[in-house]
Amino acid sequence: MSINEYAKELKAALAQYPNFPKEGVLFEDFLPIFRSPQLFQKLIDAFKMHLAEAFPETKIDYLVGLESRGFLFGPSLALAIGAGFVPVRKAGKLPGQVVKTTYVKEYEEDVFEMQVDSIPVGATVVVVDDILATGGSAGAAGDLIKQLGATILEFIFVMELDFLKGREKLQAPVFTLLQGQEEALGN
């Protein structure tokens, strides 16, 4: 199967919820993918295929998953490509010494943290999460990775809300598996 064939089948499994979590957003729930072992495997296979095509000569040392939906498929994908998995968590959830950064989410600020010893200097990293919206949380993860001295190869997402232009805030190329909402509802 090609990446596009995987994407078509995965997209058909999504549930849609108009105006959730706020007016103008068509929420496309990708959780039904995890109810089917076959679809979950196709999600992993599609990302694995993309990474092999995008980085044929580069070893990916770590996948960095964002709390919390990046944790749903990030570890499985890391295992499939022979990479480590490192979580980015909200403040106060990781033991030991951490690096932290503050980012803006719509009308409030939040803090992300990573353990200082989680990624060695010079490591190659791919950031994984479910949806690219405003780019705030993914950009914050990128800031943490740079604080640790690693190189971000790419940000990968299941889906993107194109109209929010989140990819413009990110420090590396972006790959989105499924086509998401291109404009706000009602536009």
Curated annotation (Swiss-Prot):
Return the PROSITE patterns for the record: PUR_PYR_PR_TRANSFER
Q: What is its EC number?
A: 2.4.2.7
Question: What sections of the protein cross the membrane?
Answer: none
Which pathway or pathways does this protein act in? Purine metabolism; AMP biosynthesis via salvage pathway; AMP from adenine: step 1/1
Q: Which Gene3D superfamilies match?
A: 3.40.50.2020
Q: Where in the cell is it found?
A: Cytoplasm; Nucleus
Magnesium found in the keyword field: yes
Q: Can you provide one Gene Ontology molecular function annotated for this UniProt record?
A: adenine binding
Q: Name one GO biological process term.
A: AMP salvage
Annotated S-S bridges? none
The cofactor(s) it depends on are:
Mg(2+)
Where along the chain is AMP bound? 133-137
Per UniProt, the keywords (alphabetical) are: Cytoplasm, Glycosyltransferase, Magnesium, Metal-binding, Nucleus, Purine salvage, Transferase
Question: Major location, coarse class?
Answer: cytoplasm
Query: What HAMAP family has UniProt attached to this entry?
Result: Aden_phosphoribosyltr
In UniProt terms, what function does this protein have?
Catalyzes a salvage reaction resulting in the formation of AMP, that is energically less costly than de novo synthesis.
Tell me the protein's name: Adenine phosphoribosyltransferase
Q: Which gene encodes it?
A: APT1
